[in-house]
Amino acid sequence: MSYVTTTDGVEIYYKDWGSKTARPIVFHHGWPLTADDWDGQMLYFLGKGYRVVASDRRGHGRSTQVGEGHDMDHYAADVSAVIEHLDLRDAIHIGHSTGGGQVARYIVQYGQPQGRVAKAVLVSSVPPLMVKSASHPNGIPMEFFDGIRAGLAANRAQFYVDFAAGAFYGFNRPDTKVSQGVIDNWWRQGMMGSAQAHYEGIKAFSETDQAEDLKRIEVPTLVMQGDDDQVVPYAEAALLQIKLLKYGTLKIYPGYPHGMLTTHGDVINPDLLAFIEA
């Protein structure tokens, strides 16, 4: 397996498929998953001739179960360590959910200053801010995130089964075809990681205000989200992101869930390709 060691000694696992001379696409996973969540997209774009790269966030999957740094700044720095190690340039960065926040922070702090990023995609992503606050009155009440923390602490294994079997993929909706394999794969990825990293990561994805990150992105950015996202409400995510981005394009998918990359990859993947090749 391939790893890069960060400046603070964390080993970050990554996948790197395809020709080293091909244009790179970098994928950023959501909470509490791993690079494996992008396997469908990685195979699709590998077949289109791209170089595809994805890493496990610190404390997640095969990366070091470190006790520190479970915040967007460290997430972005870890991504930069992988990108610099592989010397990726002219890259497209695609982030899902928490990974979208990671993409925004990476681009602003590293990708743009180093001239390494060409385009970005935010899929069902958490910016600008999830939690309700005085400056964000329509956000999600803190009690919701406290409930996630409580579920994780009480019985992480069962909580992850229930989360994947319910809102994440919209499997709780009537007449929805449920895939036990998809549920099991979500659970498998989640249980690979550190409970501490996942617990502390809730604060990172819910309480990090990234409005300024979005305003500072200077590359073309595609915003994609389903209007039946039960995890990250699209009215407080995609519809706000597009207002803050300088060069944004918005695509809303009627009836699609938070995990639409998996449930509707046959639609999402060609849309991603069209944006990348435009």
Protein language model annotation of sequence segments:
Residues 104-154:
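Flexible "cap/lid" loop of the alpha/beta hydrolase fold
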Residues 7-68:
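Conserved HGGG/HGGXW glycine-rich cap/lid loop of the alpha/beta-hydrolase fold
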Residues 230-236:
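Conserved alpha/beta-hydrolase "acid-adjacent" motif
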Residues 217, 223-225, 229:
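Short beta-strand/loop motif that positions the catalytic acidic residue
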Residues 29-31, 91, 95-100:
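Conserved alpha/beta-hydrolase "nucleophile elbow" surrounding the catalytic nucleophile
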